[in-house]
């Protein structure tokens, strides 16, 4: 049985539309999550506690969109080490709860804070859709 060319072209068009729709949905999700991350980490009015509390969301964003985040190799290695260390620290339990304080406390005033700043800068710098701060080139 021969399938008419018209039916095949309609089927092909439908498949292309579905694939484009899925990609657009992923882009919208990326943009939404990126905006949330930038609202927290690119806003000087947000306190350190809020930034530290949102580190798991930052890590999840990095894991979900690794190809979209352009870090130099050295920063990427440091970031991967930070993620591994942070994840390990959250899995260690003390009296049935994750350990409090330790190396994660005041994380944003340390070299890890600088690494997070580089991560946020890469989101702003390499993505043309990200609004730049007032006065930025």
From Swiss-Prot:
Query: Would the keyword Signal turn up in this protein's UniProt record?
Result: yes
Pfam families associated with the record: Turandot
Keyword terms, alphabetized: Immunity, Innate immunity, Secreted, Signal
GO annotation terms (biological process): cellular response to heat; innate immune response; response to bacterium; response to heat; response to oxidative stress
Superkingdom of this protein's organism? Eukaryota
Tell where it localizes.
Secreted
Record bears the keyword DNA damage? no
InterPro entries reported for this sequence: Turandot
What are the record's GO terms for cellular component? extracellular space
Q: Which N-terminal stretch is annotated as signal sequence?
A: 1-24
Q: What is its main location?
A: secreted
- Job of this protein: A humoral factor that may play a role in stress tolerance.
Describe the family membership recorded for this protein in Swiss-Prot or TrEMBL: Belongs to the Turandot family.
Query: What is the protein named?
Result: Protein Turandot X
* Organism expressing this protein natively: Drosophila pseudoobscura pseudoobscura
Q: Which gene encodes it?
A: TotX
């Amino acid at each position: 049985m021969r399938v008419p060319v018209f039916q095949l072209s309609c089927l092909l068009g439908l498949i292309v539309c579905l694939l484009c729709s899925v990609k657009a949905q992923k882009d919208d999700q990326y943009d939404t999550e990126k905006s949330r991350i930038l609202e927290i980490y690119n806003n000087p009015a947000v306190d350190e506690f809020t930034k530290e509390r949102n580190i798991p969301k930052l890590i999840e964003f990095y894991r979900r969109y690794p190809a979209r985040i352009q870090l130099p190799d050295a920063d990427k290695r440091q970031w991967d080490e930070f993620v591994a260390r942070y994840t390990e620290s959250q899995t260690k339990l003390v009296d049935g709860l994750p350990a409090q304080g330790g190396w994660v406390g005041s994380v944003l005033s340390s070299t890890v804070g600088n690494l997070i700043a580089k991560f946020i800068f890469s989101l702003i710098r390499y993505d043309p859709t990200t609004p730049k701060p007032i006065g930025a080139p």
